Each structure stands twice: as C-alpha cells, then as structure tokens.
C-alpha cells in the first residue's frame, strides 16, 4: 500500500533519518488514508528522544508543550506537526493518565500502548505499512477492536469507552464482541473522567450517522453520565433522531425534550452558554403553534436562535409540523424584508421619546408598532407610525 505523504511531513522524516533515527506517520492519518477519508493532521513517531529531536530540529520553530511526555510540535511549512518519541507507559493510577512514561527504541512497543487496532498503523516510504495488531484487517471488516486485552485497555483509560462509540458511529463500524463486553462491564469507570472530556466525546457521538444504534445498544453506558435518559425515553426519541441532521445541539435537544431538568444536565456536562441557548430554545418552543405567515413573524420576533436550526429540530420531533409552508413563508419574509424585529422598525426609542413619552411607555409603544407592521408590513414607515402613535395618544 502506497500512501502519499505531504512534502512538509516527508521533510521532517528525512531529517530524522539523515540524523540516524527512524520515523513513521502513525495513527489517524494512516487509518483515514486507507479509508480514503480526509486527513486533517499528521502525527509522527520516532526513536529520537525529545532532547535529540530538539537538536535535529534546531533550525525549525519548535514548541515544547508536551515534552515531558515525549512530544514536541514542529512548525513545518507553517503547519504544526506533533512528533513523539517511541514510548511505553507505566501503571495508570486514575483510569485516565499513566503515572509516567518510559522512552523506547521499539516501534512495536509504542504501538502496543495505543487504544484500537485501527489507530496503531504506521507508515513511511522506505518500510511501507507496518501493522502489528491486525488493524488493516479490522478496517476491511469495519471493526473497532482494542489492542490486546480490552479490559486492560479500558481500565488504563476509561475515555476509550466513549472513543470506541465515537469511532464506531463516525465510521459506521461494529465494536468487536470482547471490546463491547468490556465497555458494558466497565462503564462505571467513566465516573473518573472529567465532564469536559465526556462532553467533547459525546458531541462527537451525537454527530454520527449511527447514533440511533449507539443509543439502543449502549444506553447503559450513556446513562452513566446522563442518568435521566431512561431506556423508554431513549426509545421514544429514536424516530426523531433518525429524521434529524448530524447536528449535536439539535440531537441533544431531541433527547432532552421531555426531561424537566435539561438545563442542569447541560451545565453538568459543561455545555457552553451558546450551546445551551440553542438546545433550550428548541425545547422551549417544541409545541409552538405555527399555521400562518403572521404567526411565523410573531414567533421570529421572540426566537433567539437561527430559524433554520429550530425549523430542522421541529420537523424531526413533529411530522405534523407544516415544514414546507413555514419554509416558504420564511423565504417570503426574508425576500421582501418584512419587519419582525424591533430593529426592523422605521422608528426607534428616540423617535418616541421626541413625541413626549418616557420609560416603559417607550417600550410598550415600540412593541405596539412592531405588532402593527407584522400584520401590515406596508405601514413600516416613520410618518405612518408617528401618526399612529399620535392618534392613540
């Protein structure tokens, strides 16, 4: 198998080789090359120690942020490239981090510490593809399999539970039986993982095509960090999930739609304020009656998220929602620049203040004007609105 390595990566491998060290592209880049998927970054592994790497790349800009673990980042053609010394890891004391790392001269030893067979593939142009653990066979058969004993791999790093689900979902792979058994049996180890890490992996899982099957087959795992999601509530949402796009916020809103403490769950899982706004706004308006263009404009005046997000969410949860009519109305409103927000009005608070109103009166009049132009957009004219205000004075 021949893999095309970019010049900015090959030059780093060549420089290490020139100085007597071996070097390989490792991990996700090789996996994605085999699957003909986009490659977003290239990671290198080498038998050079961090000190030796600093000497080799003395003419490059180097960041030493991970040097205590054997990793440096080299800027090559303005692209950051992580290069890590072959290593083995000591005992894991917290089901997440090794107590220490030991540098190695063995590429096989380095690959042995990785999570899944499909992520332990190495390549360089001189030696070709190196596959110690059957990763290519697992890629061909679409299998996620832990390297070695899956119970040991998960005990070392419990985040591998969610990584397995994410890879299986993203690639539409099946989790191998022994690995799946270990995931179910050791799911409680997720309590050792920070909410931030869980959040990041969970978002990745939500954005996969295989989310419905993951929710069905691994509900017990998901209930470790979202215990409020009962088996029945998950099953109830599956059809909506199937209709939804691969959008993490929309899918989280679907899952939490009928759960009363959604905001607490989102805060517990370290969702950002922006994410919470989208999710909670969708949930809040789940049953909003929308049958006409005027109703849609009134709704848009209160909606604090993009309409296309709400529109997609609403159709996913409600097949009776008149999505084609609402989409047509929405485009009519936008194409004609029909007003539905206070900022769309031809007048503002200063205009009303100039007529003689103060305080809350100004806000009340602005909203009355907005209601007028929502029903009669042709009246969104400063003179017409001022005359209307004076007539009601």
Where are these regions (language model features)?
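Catalytic cores of the polymerase beta-like nucleotidyltransferase superfamily
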Residues: 1-393
């Amino acid at each position: 198998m021949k893999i095309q390595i970019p010049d900015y990566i090959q030059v780093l491998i060549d420089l290490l080789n020139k100085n007597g060290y071996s070097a390989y592209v490792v991990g996700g880049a090789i996996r994605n090359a085999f699957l003909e998927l986009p490659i977003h970054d290239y990671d290198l592994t080498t038998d050079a120690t961090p000190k030796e790497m600093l000497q080799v790349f003395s003419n490059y800009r180097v960041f030493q942020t991970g040097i205590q673990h054997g990793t440096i980042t080299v800027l090559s053609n303005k692209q950051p490239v992580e290069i890590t010394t072959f290593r083995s890891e000591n005992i894991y004391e917290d089901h997440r981090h090794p107590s220490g790392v030991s540098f190695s001269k063995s590429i096989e030893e380095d690959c042995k510490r990785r999570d899944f067979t499909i992520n332990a593939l190495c390549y360089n142009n001189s030696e070709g593809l190196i596959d110690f653990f059957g990763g290519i066979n697992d890629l061909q058969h679409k299998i996620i399999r832990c390297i070695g004993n899956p119970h040991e791999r998960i005990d070392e790093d419990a985040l591998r539970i969610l990584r397995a689900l994410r890879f299986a979902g993203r690639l539409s792979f099946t989790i191998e039986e022994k690995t799946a058994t270990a995931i179910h049996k050791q799911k409680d180890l997720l309590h050792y993982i920070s909410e931030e890490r869980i959040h990041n992996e969970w978002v990745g899982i939500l954005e996969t095509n295989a989310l419905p099957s993951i929710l069905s087959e691994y509900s017990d795992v998901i209930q470790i960090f979202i215990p409020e999601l009962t088996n029945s509530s998950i099953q109830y949402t599956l059809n909506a999930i199937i209709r939804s796009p691969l959008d993490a916020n929309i899918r989280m809103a679907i899952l939490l739609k009928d759960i009363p403490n959604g905001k607490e769950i989102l805060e517990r899982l370290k969702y950002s304020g922006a994410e919470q706004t989208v999710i909670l706004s969708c949930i809040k308006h789940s049953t909003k009656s929308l049958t006409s263009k005027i109703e849609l404009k009134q709704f848009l005046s209160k909606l604090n998220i993009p309409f296309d997000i709400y529109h997609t969410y609403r159709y996913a949860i409600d097949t009776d929602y008149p999505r084609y009519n609402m989409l047509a109305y929405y485009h009519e409103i936008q194409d004609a620049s029909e007003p539905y927000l206070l900022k769309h009005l031809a007048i503002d608070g200063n205009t009303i203040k100039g007529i003689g109103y103060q305080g809350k009166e100004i806000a009340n009049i602005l909203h009355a004007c907005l209601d007028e132009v929502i029903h009669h957009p042709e009246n969104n004219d400063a003179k017409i609105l001022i005359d209307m205000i004076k007539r009601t004075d």
